[in-house]
Amino acid sequence: MATTVTAPVANQIALAAKYAPFLDEIYRQDSKSAILDTANQFVNFTGANTVNIFNLTTVGMANYDRNAGFVPGDANGTWQPYVLETDRGRSYMIDVLDNDETLGMAFGSLLSTVERQHVIPEVDAFRFAQYASGAAAGNVTTETLSAGAATIASIDAATVALDNAEVPYEGRILFVSPTVYGLIKAGITRMVMNGENNVNYGVEIYNDMRIIRVPQPRFQTSITLNTGTTSSAAGGYSPTATTGKAINYMIIHPTAVLQVMKHYVPRIFSPEVNQEADAWKLNMRYAHGAWVLSHKTNGIYVSHA
């Protein structure tokens, strides 16, 4: 009994370990928000669902007295807790014969398909909605952009607002919808020759800000995560009714946000271990969170419809 159970379980652990780097590579390639991932050295986990991030507050300069010397000032460092809001998952099964008849491609394709079609878009949408709702009130603009010149003027005004808030110039990232990206191209006169008969009108950087295009379904001010049960069996996410607005563009300085993927591991069960059916079983679960740091809300600027 011990022999027949232990070997398959060990095999499934090995399979999960094998697929984990593969899934991480897909995430890095396809995610639009991965560029904002928080460095692990700045994050401290406490318990199952709490993330602590170090926050340092100081006071400003004071007059120096030649007799009394320096005026004392406070420098306080604290760990601020953030609770993971999102714990998502789904279970899938591929019949053993279906998998055999496709030379194992059915199960192998399942992993990449789930990640590309469901996990990555939902994680992106959740993060951008969190950042849109967490931006300082004065950094949120409602507008309809339909011309290149007006779009460029709007983005320039946004950068001025960030400049005045003393958000660092270096490292800002300009996330744009596909429509706004087209308007940016229309508003800028330039052309790059990439070899014979090859002309490129693309824009990768604007005013030192890297441009990242985000599909509009992932780019909403508010989303609803569907339960995946009877009332919303398809699962996934959708723009929140009435409050979910299409984002035109968003400028984010990475230091203004915190995003963490706490748990993202596939659990794989072979037909020998699966007690429910003669099938390969895949359980996908991921717990994550995204926040705008309370003292850096000016580090985000949002334009939405």
Language model regions located:
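Sequence/fold signature of self-assembling virion shell proteins
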Residues: 2-60, 80-85, 91, 102, ...
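Short secondary-structure transition/capping segments
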Residues: 129-139, 166-181, 217-226, 267-276
